[in-house]
Amino acid sequence: EWKYKKEVPPRLGLIIDDTLGTPLMAKPSAGLLNLCIKHRHIGKGLGISIYMCVQSYCSQGGINRAIRENTTLLLLFKINQEAQIKKVMEESDLPLSDERFHEMCKYCHDKPFNFLAMDFAPKDESKRFRSGWDEYIS
């Protein structure tokens, strides 16, 4: 018997860290792409949240494009390679200019250990972008 007043199903989460260049990322037979696409339907609809910690947005043996395009929330820490930033802008199809995106990145990354959070499915459009966890920006 459930010991709490309100019945809440368990929440499942999978953290994938430091796997660039490994068979998990490089081989389709490893099943990562399939898991990421079908994650909402696992466990009879219970689903699983997948958190991927990577040091490169797109690279050889890195995150598959289909996974990148199905991302719900992207935390973008400082990137020094302009090609990577451009790739994020291209694939994200953000509702803002490249110039504004660069301004937002600079604003967020000027603070130590901070990130630009991009929510690709916000319930409120004004909450699409954040500096860190606490500050909404537009």
Q: What does each model-found stretch correspond to?
A:
Residues 1-99, 103:
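Conserved P-loop NTPase motor cores
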Residues 104-108:
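Short proline/glycine-enriched turn/loop segments at secondary-structure junctions
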Residues 111-138:
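Conserved P-loop NTPase motor module
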